[in-house]
């Protein structure tokens, strides 16, 4: 454990950030899973609505640096292609 006051403060801040980031990452994954589930139902309207919500969340996480921009693009393009296939 840290002995210097500033190091203790940094440890506390780091733990707080870790917990917040974990929460945000979990929320993002939930939106992605909901979108995959909506695509699996085969209803294009529902899937499209879920995709729009997921896209907002993924873009926000990428802009904040929680995930890489390319990872966000991969999620969006993969799901967009699946939604496009739906009749």
From Swiss-Prot:
GO terms for cellular component: cytosol; small ribosomal subunit. Keywords: Ribonucleoprotein, Ribosomal protein, RNA-binding, rRNA-binding. Belongs to the bacterial ribosomal protein bS20 family. One of its GO terms (molecular function) is small ribosomal subunit rRNA binding. GO terms for biological process: translation. This is Small ribosomal subunit protein bS20. PANTHER family: 30S RIBOSOMAL PROTEIN S20, SMALL RIBOSOMAL SUBUNIT PROTEIN BS20C. Residues 1-11 have a biased composition (Basic residues). Residues 1-27 are annotated as: Disordered. InterPro entries: Ribosomal_bS20, Ribosomal_bS20_sf.
